[in-house]
């Protein structure tokens, strides 16, 4: 039994091609290397125990990114994918190296500088500011390494040419350009773009005119984004539109070595006919609101008058006070008008329901003379 167990263990080791002790060592090496093996080697096949055959070429180094996280993160995922793509042109800008004749010229220049050292050093050293970086081209080849600066840098006056790149925030004003909205309105917008240079070597080797490239890119991006939005959304959601435009621009400009910090829609210009139609529509909406408010006010006033009439009908003294208050207000507002008040009892008789059924009281006709209520007695003939 022991021999069978030993033979089976040997067969399993021979089939696997490696022992458990070696597997543990390899796992520890992968952990200590920080995932270096996953980047350099390709994916292992599921059914084989070997990483690959010796004759196959090894895959180039690449950055490992979780695809699910990139898709789920939205805007951050777009920026990550763009940054990964920006690594390719950066690798392509590396110099292939100088030739034999070029190295000979470099040695001659160095010897000449050494021979005239006290005076030549002033022509071989330049100063770079804190906000600047310098890219050096030697005989047309981009020198390897990072951009020079800030501080002093050395170059060969006869063979080298240098270019300074400003890393401060740049402002670019985008002129008015026409766009077509989702609801088929034609309008003009202008914007302001804030960007900065991040990779000086990549910028100089990729673009000839930075401002024109950024301007045209902003215009085409704004046309593409605003074509999926209505006129109302463009007027009300400028902040979200600017954020979407920033993400879309940054995903392209990072390949050029440019970082878009912010973009804002400055003004929206509508055609004259569209402005007139929108003004008429807004005026109609305002008039409708005014009518609704006036109707609500009349309704509230009539309700208040009805409640006041009910209260006054229950208290006769309140009616008399209201009558006197009305007479006083008339005398103060129009002092030239003479008001002859009627007796309040007569008003009660006129407004009583019995008088309404029987008819109004007979008033004397203006043609007949009115007899006084208490006629004076005539003097006797004796007096």
From Swiss-Prot:
Residues 103-123 dip into the membrane without crossing it. The keyword Lipoprotein applies. InterPro entries: Band-7_stomatin-like (IPR043202), Band_7 (IPR001107), Band_7/SPFH_dom_sf (IPR036013), Band_7/stomatin-like_CS (IPR018080), Stomatin_HflK_fam (IPR001972). Changing residue 310 to V: In NPHS2; uncertain significance. Residues 1-41, 374-383 have a biased composition (Basic and acidic residues). Changing residue 187 to I: In NPHS2; uncertain significance. Residues 1-76, 355-383 are annotated as: Disordered. GO terms for cellular component: cell-cell junction; cytoplasmic side of plasma membrane; endoplasmic reticulum; extracellular exosome; membrane raft; plasma membrane; protein-containing complex; slit diaphragm. Residues 1-102, 124-383 are cytoplasmic. Keywords: Cell membrane, Disease variant, Endoplasmic reticulum, Glycoprotein, Lipoprotein, Membrane, Palmitate. A lipid is attached at residue 101 (S-palmitoyl cysteine). One of its GO terms (biological process) is metanephric podocyte development. It is linked to Nephrotic syndrome 2: A form of nephrotic syndrome, a renal disease clinically characterized by severe proteinuria, resulting in complications such as hypoalbuminemia, hyperlipidemia and edema. Kidney biopsies show non-specific histologic changes such as focal segmental glomerulosclerosis and diffuse mesangial proliferation. The disorder is resistant to steroid treatment and progresses to end-stage renal failure in the first or second decades. Some patients show later onset of the disorder. PANTHER family: BAND 7 PROTEIN-RELATED, PODOCIN. Interacts with nephrin/NPHS1 and KIRREL1. Interacts directly with CD2AP. Interacts with DDN. Belongs to the band 7/mec-2 family. Plays a role in the regulation of glomerular permeability, acting probably as a linker between the plasma membrane and the cytoskeleton. This is Podocin. It comes from Homo sapiens (Human). The lineage of its organism: Eukaryota, Metazoa, Chordata, Craniata, Vertebrata. The gene is NPHS2.
């Amino acid at each position: 039994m022991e021999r069978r167990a030993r033979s089976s263990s040997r067969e399993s080791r021979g089939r696997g091609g490696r022992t458990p002790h070696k597997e543990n060592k390899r796992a520890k090496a992968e952990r200590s290397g920080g995932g270096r093996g996953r980047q350099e080697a390709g994916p292992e096949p599921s059914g084989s125990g070997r990483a690959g055959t010796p004759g196959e070429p090894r895959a180039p180094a690449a950055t490992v990114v979780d695809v699910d996280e990139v898709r789920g993160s939205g805007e951050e995922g777009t920026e990550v994918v763009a940054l990964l793509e920006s690594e390719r042109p950066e690798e392509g800008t590396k110099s292939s190296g100088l030739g034999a004749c070029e190295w000979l010229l470099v040695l001659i220049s160095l010897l000449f500088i050494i021979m005239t050292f006290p005076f030549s050093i002033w022509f071989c050293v330049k100063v770079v500011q804190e906000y600047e970086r310098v890219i050096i081209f030697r005989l047309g080849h981009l020198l390897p390494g990072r951009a020079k600066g800030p501080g002093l840098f050395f170059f060969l006056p006869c063979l080298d040419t240098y270019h300074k790149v400003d890393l401060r925030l740049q402002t670019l004003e985008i002129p008015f350009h026409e766009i077509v909205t989702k609801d088929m309105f034609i309008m003009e917008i202008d914007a302001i773009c804030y960007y900065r240079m991040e990779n000086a070597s990549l910028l100089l080797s990729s673009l000839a005119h930075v401002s024109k490239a950024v301007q045209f890119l902003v215009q085409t991006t704004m046309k593409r984004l605003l074509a999926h939005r209505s006129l109302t959304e463009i007027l009300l959601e400028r902040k979200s539109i600017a954020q979407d435009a920033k993400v879309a621009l940054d995903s392209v400009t990072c390949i050029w070595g440019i970082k878009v910090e912010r973009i804002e829609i400055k003004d929206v210009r509508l055609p004259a006919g569209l402005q007139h139609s929108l003004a008429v529509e807004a005026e109609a909406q305002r008039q409708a609101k005014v009518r609704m408010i006036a109707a609500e006010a009349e309704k509230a006033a009539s309700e208040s008058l009805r409640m006041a009439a009910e209260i006054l009908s229950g208290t006769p003294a309140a009616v008399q006070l209201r009558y006197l208050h009305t007479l006083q207000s008339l005398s103060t507002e129009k002092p030239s008008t003479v008001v002859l008040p009627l007796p309040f009892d007569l008003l009660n008789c006129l407004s009583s329901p019995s008088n309404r059924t029987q008819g109004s009281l007979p008033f004397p006709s203006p043609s007949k003379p009115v007899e006084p209520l208490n006629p004076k007695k005539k003097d006797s003939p004796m007096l």
